[in-house]
């Protein structure tokens, strides 16, 4: 029998990479898509015909019950969320509904309709927020500073609660920033590689950035979805931090991207724009992924410069094609 996996957020960066991985592993893949909205299928274009799409919404319990009951999945991956931290201050209620309560609705649907199914909750390094401890591991206290992070903390503890209360296989992956050529253009890394490519081909003169000094632990997304899958293959459900253990600033990312594009006077293209500053900034996130290494045998492979290269080359190709039109 083929294993069945049900993925929320399947059209996003992580969902699409996870779907590809599971298809390679001969899973039957089901993906939740929202009705009545414009779903962007760009990331799953090449595998559309191999996925069964199910309509539903993390804001609607009945649709989730129906989906889980019908599919009877072996594994459920909750990657669906409003994932851009910046907008969480302007839409805190919607953020909490989808990212926080959405996780609860889905695990509740699993408990009631497919209790033997394994459940993965996509947590985030943002839960550590304004932490005093570095690096951060599974025992670091949470100090969330954005509505997004607070919603993720709620989802995290609900997952732990269902594991402990009902004996469900439910695990949290606390993933540090992971990027790729499929990252949304609103995210700073992709904004930089897209912007550098536009400048290189004469389509733009500037990149507007908020905080140059924010430091993050950036890895390559396809490796992280493999980590998710590994967590779900364990005998016992547990929570894991995934990250590279290295930290770089936004400024370093900018310098590296411009250097790789062969532009040395990067300063003249960067405009500091206060509107991109967050009401509360997370200063310094860096992972201690030693538990994942020891227990799962998982390790981030793609180094910082290589990550910038992958993203920049993709955007250079894309923008070059646009500039020729």
Where in the sequence are the language-model features?
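N-terminal Rossmann-like NAD(P)+-binding domain of SDR-like oxidoreductases, especially those catalyzing
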Residues: 1-178, 232, 302, 309-317, ...
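C-terminal substrate-binding subdomain of Rossmann-fold SDR/epimerase-dehydratase oxidoreductases
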Residues: 18, 24, 31-32, 56-59, ...
């Amino acid at each position: 029998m083929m294993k069945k996996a049900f993925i929320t957020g399947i059209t996003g960066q992580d969902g699409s990479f996870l779907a590809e991985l599971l298809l390679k592993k001969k899973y039957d893949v089901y993906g939740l898509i929202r009705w009545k909205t414009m779903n962007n299928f760009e990331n799953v274009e090449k595998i559309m015909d191999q996925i069964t799409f199910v309509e539903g919404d993390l804001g609607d319990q009945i649709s989730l019950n129906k989906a889980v009951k019908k599919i009877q999945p072996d594994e459920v991956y909750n990657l669906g969320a409003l994932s851009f931290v910046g907008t969480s201050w302007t839409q805190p209620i919607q953020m909490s509904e989808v990212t926080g309560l959405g996780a609860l609705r889905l695990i509740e649907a699993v408990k009631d309709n497919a209790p033997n199914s394994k459940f993965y909750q996509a947590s985030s390094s943002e839960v550590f927020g304004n932490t005093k401890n570095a690096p951060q591991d599974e025992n670091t206290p949470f100090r969330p500073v954005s509505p997004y992070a607070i919603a993720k903390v709620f989802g995290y503890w609900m997952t732990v609660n269902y594991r402990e209360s009902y004996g469900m296989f439910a695990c949290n992956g606390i993933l540090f920033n992971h990027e790729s050529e499929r990252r949304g253009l609103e995210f700073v890394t992709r904004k930089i590689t897209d912007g550098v490519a536009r400048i290189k081909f004469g389509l733009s003169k500037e990149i507007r950035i908020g905080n140059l000094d924010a430091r993050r632990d950036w890895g390559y997304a396809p490796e992280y979805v493999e980590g998710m899958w590994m967590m779900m293959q364990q005998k016992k459900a547990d929570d894991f931090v995934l990250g590279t253990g290295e930290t770089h600033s936004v400024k370093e990312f900018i310098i590296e991207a411009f250097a790789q594009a062969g532009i040395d006077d990067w300063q003249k293209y960067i405009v500091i724009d206060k509107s991109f500053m967050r009401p509360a900034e997370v200063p310094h996130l860096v992972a201690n992924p030693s538990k994942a290494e020891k227990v799962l045998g998982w390790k981030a492979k793609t180094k910082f410069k290589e990550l910038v290269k992958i993203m920049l080359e993709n955007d250079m190709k894309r923008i070059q094609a646009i500039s020729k039109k």
